[in-house]
Every structure is written in structure tokens, then in C-alpha cells.
Amino acid sequence: MEELEILRKKLYSIQRQDNTQKLSERNCIEIIVKMIDLKMIDIIHSLDGKEYITPKQLENEIKDEILKCGGRVVVCDLQSILSIDIIHIEEALEKLKKRDKSIQIYQGEIMTRYYLDSILQEIQEQLQEVGKLHINDLSNRFSIGVDFLINLIEQNLKKFNRSLNNSTNNNNNNNNILLKNIIFDNQEVLYTQSHINRHYHKVIGLFSSITQPILINNVIKQHQNHYQLNERLVRQQLQELIENKRINGFIQGKASNAEFIPTIFSQSRLKWIDSFYHQNQFITFDSVSKLQINEPQSFLKNTFTDGLLLHSCFIHKSLIDKIDDNIIEIIENSNWLDLIPLLPPLTDKDISMIVSNCPNMKTNNAILLGNSFIISKSFVDRCFTLLQKTIQERMEKQQLILENIASSNIKKQQQSKSEIIDQKIETTTTTTTTTQPSKKKDNLINSDDDDNQDNNKKSSKGKNKKSKQQQSSIQKLINDSEDDYKVYNKKQENNNNNKKVDHLKEINQLLSKWYENMEEELVESLSQYLRPLVNQSWESMVKEAKEKLENETQKQRKQQLQQLNSQFFSLYNSFLLFRKGLQSLNDADDDNGKTIIALEKHLLKTVGINITNLLIEINANYHMLDKTTFETPSERSLILSQFPPQLSKSFEKLIQSLNKSTLNDFIDSLENVCSQSQIKLKSLDKKLEKQLLIENQNELEEQFLNEIDVGNQFQIIVNLMYIRYKNNYIFSPPRLIGKLVSTLVMDTSIDKEIITRLTKLHQEIVKLITNNKLSNQDNDNDSTELNDHIKFFKDLILN
């Protein structure tokens, strides 16, 4: 530095001299920069570049500036004050901090120890004046962060505490301690010990005068303006006073709900609770809560060991023993008990809990009803037995009524259908031109053909025995009636499913009738208890009856299906027999097949329709439809709509084939439907054909003996002659019977006398019909020749 000073002086003297050769400022700057680069000198230039300063001088100037500012200065302010770049200032400050521990930097500010000590000294002086200071107020006052200020205060307090613990060094350290006898509460408030003592005595005075429970927060708010109480300090000191028994009482609750309860109040309260409990054998939680006890359940449980906690009250166990003794009595006598007179005014839930704690209730020999009645199980069982017997009698009566109704309906339908069956049997093989057609189920195809006049005179069993036809028809009528009854039952079942039978009203009435002295509330409660049992018993009875009826119905349906199948095959075999007869007649047809076409149409309109209807009924039974029979085309269409789509279409084709003139389309459609219905069709063999011919012949002979109408007698004679000599049966309407006569006349194997008499008989019949003399055959038929011919054929047939 001395050399530098010498050089500076030389430079100054040279510059002062008048010389023609002088260095410019630029040259001087370049020389200095070169010397700095060569590390010949260590200097720092100012911000304007016109001045230079050494690092040592910079440190000195920083110290001077700190002293000038009272020990606290902002680092950024030094740049403008010293006109030195901030980087050089920060480097100089780091060196200063290492050498001088009293200097520290906090949030961009330089603070010295003596400055911080002055702050602590000022805090100490102010505390002695006011007694307490808040840390936030101090932070705002000194413009220092709260954390830094807290740390500063705590360090000083730690030194003070260590000095108290170390008495040997106490005198040496007291000089460095500025805060003495200070309490720093929760790093928020500074108190002097004298202030704490004054606050302590305020708490003693306030809470010693309290005789009623009061919230601690309310005490603080009421006396805040006058005593300036601190909530946290009050709680802490009050707890300490209670523990030291300086104040008689206790704190109940926490935080803002903390409540001070003086001992004098708790003692009088406990005395009242004890007196009420032992006099009444119970006490409610509400009454205890009104005495400012926050947890009455825990309080009562800890206070009285001979009681039981319920939902809303606390009772003495002697009440349970009293109720239990009465329960034993009603169990032994099969009676009931009303609890209301035996108990204090309790809630339903309390009574239920009392009953559940009775030992005899755990044996399941008694039950609680209506929340206040105990009734023995044996008494309940007796009531249920009586009710069950009553509803069983009711069920039997209803079942008997239904059976009578169903039986009556069946008898009526049997009677009506028997009349129809008899009419069918009479018109199966014998018709006259005067017979009026009747509307029947056997003919559901509308046609303009004249054959419709004769459709009603043919039945599905026309070629079987009369007795078999009657039995099968009557059995079918019975099955139809049972189907109707099943439909009724299904409707009833659907109604029952939608709305189940409830016997509550009936149970209530019966119990009131049987036990007149029983309380109305108990009657209602017992009815509600027995209600599901009685309803379930009723439902089981109904279910059992339904299952029985369903089993019978299924059995009947199965039998009916078997009968329908038997009828179908019998009718189908007759159809094959009639078809074979038409084929034999085809060879002798001499009118271009018109007669054959008419006979085939007649066969389709009669036997074909019956086969179709019978097949629909078989499928309706197979698919378990509610309605299996029908009387009109609309009813038949409704049944077909419930079949599977493919089967329904096949039936539509079968019905359409009935309106055609040939049998081939009908047979093809019939085979298709039978294949889908799992019905196997068989051809007519010789043995069965012969059997059918014999049966039809015997039936015609029997009808001939009982027939008095001449026209019908003639038709029977022609059919019998055709069966005898042609071994075939032609199913012909009356208007085409002449074709059969012509065929027989052309047969050379028949005796000429028979042919002659048959021809004359035909002529007489035609003559009578033409002259309208058959209107009253019993009185008007006086033709001797006609009677002679008929007598001849009668003898021939019978022999």
C-alpha cells in the first residue's frame, strides 16, 4: 500500500507539472485495467468508472454506513450509497460476517448484535410498563418477521433459564441477558411474571364466586373489558387451581363447550337425582340433561350400580324382577298381562328393552304385543288353532259351493250337448228333403254350394257305432266343461296373485267375540300378530286345493287328449273308407265326373270339417290353451292365433283346402298339419276296412228297423245294398242317391228281381217327393206298392 501511495504521489506530481507530453484519462484507464489483469494491483472501480477503491476500503465504508444507520441497513441501499456494484458489496459482506459474528443478514437486511440488543431492551422496557405484548404487534412495530423475532426472543430466554440453573456463572451471564422474568406464551404473547400473578388472582376471584354451572367462554366474554383475560391462560390457571383444590369444582367438556361446575352445585344436583331415582325407581335422561349433565347415560351408570340403561331413562332392577314375576304367572295360566299399570310412564322402546331383559321372556314362552302387552305363547297357539279351524271350515264351504256350481254347469252342458248328439246320430246316415239344417260346430265353412243344406246331417262319428258316438260325445262335453272351470280357476288365481286375501278384519271380529274382556289394543295387536300366520295357512290351503285341482285337470286333459286322438283316428279311417268308395264309383261315372266332384265336396264339407275341427282341438289341448273348444269361425281363429306361427299357417292352408273340389289338396294339407302335430297317419288296411264296413252295416240295419220315414228308409236300403254288393260305402247326400242306384242297376251280379224292385222303389220315392206327399209320412203314405217294395228289402236285409 505504501508503494501504491508513492506511485500515486508521483503520478500526481507529474500531472501537476507543465509538460508537453501528458497521459489522457483513457490511457490511464487502460493502464489500470492492464495492471488489474496482470494482478499487479487489487482495486474495485465505481459504477461510473471514474473512481477506484480497494476491497479493504470497501469493507471500512460498509462498516461506517452500518454505524451511521444505527446497526441496520438494507443491502440494496449500499449500492446507491457507495456507488459500487452489488456483487462486490455482497462479497465484502461475506468477509465481514466471517470476521465479525455480531453482523448477520436477514431477508436482505444487515443487522448487528447491538441493534438486536436494542430491540430486546426496548421490548423489556415496554413489557415492564404494560405487562404483556403480542408478537404480531412487535413484528409490525420493528418491521421484522415474526419467525425471526420469535427466534431472537427464545434465544434470550434460553440464556436466562441457563443462568438460573447455573448459579456460579449467573453474575457473568446476566450482563448479556436483556429479557428477564418474561413468559413467552405459546410463541404468541409475552408476559411479565407480575402480569401472570395478577391474572392468576383475577381467575381465583371470578371462579370462587360462581355457584351455578357456566361456560368458561361466557365468563371470559363477560369480564373481558374490565379484567382483560386471556382465554388460554384462564383455562390453564383454572385447571391448576382445581388440581390444587384452591377452587372447588370441575371442568366438563372441551374447547368452546368447556363448562365450569362448582362443587356446591354438583353436590345438590347429585342429591336431587339420588332422591328422585330411589323414590320412583327410574329417572329419565332428559331430566338429568336439564341439570346440565352432558352425558347422562355415563353419569347414571357410574353413579348407580343397581340400575339398567334404557333408551330414554335409567331404571332400578327391581322393576325387571317385578315384571318377570308377573310373566311367570301368565305363562302358567295361559293368559295375558298389561304392563302399563305396573311401570312408570316410559316409552314403547323402553318397555321393549325391559321385557327383553326379563329372564322368562328368553324362554320363548311369552311374547310382547302392542308395546305394552305380554301374552303367553300357549294362549296365542290356542287362538291360532281356533282361527285355523274356522278358515278351514270356510275353505271347505267355498270348495263345496264351487264344486256344486261346476257340477251344475257340467250337467246343463251335458244335457244340451246330449240333445245335439242325439240329433246328429239320427241324421248321420238318414236324411230327407224336409229335414231343416241346424247350426253346429261341425260346420264352420261358409259356402254357396247346395251341399250346405246337408252338412248338418253328417257327424264325425257317422260311420261308427251309435253307443260309442254317444259316449265319446258326452265325455268330450265333460272335458269342455272342466276346461271352462279351469279357466275360471285361473282367473281366480290371477286375481288372488294381484290381491291376496287378508283375514285381519275377520280375525279381529272373532277375537273380540271369543274374548270380550280383552283390551281393544291387545285385540288389534294380537290380530296383527296372527295375521301373517292365518294368511299363510289360508294360502297353503288354497295352494293345496289348487294343486289338487290342477292334478285332476291335468289328468282329465290327458284323458281328453287320448279320447280326442282316438276320435280323430276313427274319423280319419272313416274318411279313408269314404274316399275309397268314391274311387270305386269313379270308374262307373258317366257324367264327366260331375257326380264325383259333388260327392268329394260333400265329403269335405262334412267329414273333412269335422277332422279339421277335431285336429284344432287336439292341438289346443296339447299346447295347454285356456279355451280348447269353439263354436264360430272367429273363436276358431282366436285359437289358431295362439298356436306357433308355422303350425297356424299350416292350419290356414288346411281350412282353405276345404273349399276346393278335390280331396288331394286336403289330404296333403292334413298330412302336413299332422306331421307338425306329431300325429302319425296310417293307411287303411284290408282288415280295418272290413271291420269298418261291418260296423256301418250293422248300424244302418239297426236304424232301418227303427226308421218310419220312407225317404230315410230308401236311403238306408241303397247304402246297405251298396255295401253288400260293392264292398264300399259311399257318403252321399240325398240328392245324389240316384247315382248309387244307377251304379247298382248296372251291376250284373245282382239278382234281377232286386234290381227291378230297387228301380221301382226309386221311381216311387221320386214321384212322392215331386208331388210333395212326404210332408206327413205317418198319415199320407198309403201306397201299397211302395210298402210292398220296402217290406221286400226289409226281409232281404234282415235275412
Curated annotation (Swiss-Prot):
Residues 458-468 have a biased composition (Basic residues). Its EC number is 2.3.2.-. One of its GO terms (molecular function) is UFM1 ligase activity. The keyword Transcription does not apply. Residues 469-478 have a biased composition (Low complexity). InterPro entries: Ufl1 (IPR018611), Ufl1-like_C (IPR056761), Ufl1_dom (IPR056580), Ufl1_N (IPR056579). Residues 429-483 are annotated as: Disordered. It holds the Pfam family E3_UFM1_ligase. GO terms for cellular component: endoplasmic reticulum membrane. GO terms for biological process: protein ufmylation; response to endoplasmic reticulum stress; reticulophagy. The keyword Cytoplasm does not apply. Keywords: Transferase, Ubl conjugation pathway. E3 UFM1-protein ligase that mediates ufmylation of target proteins. Belongs to the UFL1 family. This is E3 UFM1-protein ligase 1 homolog. It comes from Dictyostelium discoideum.
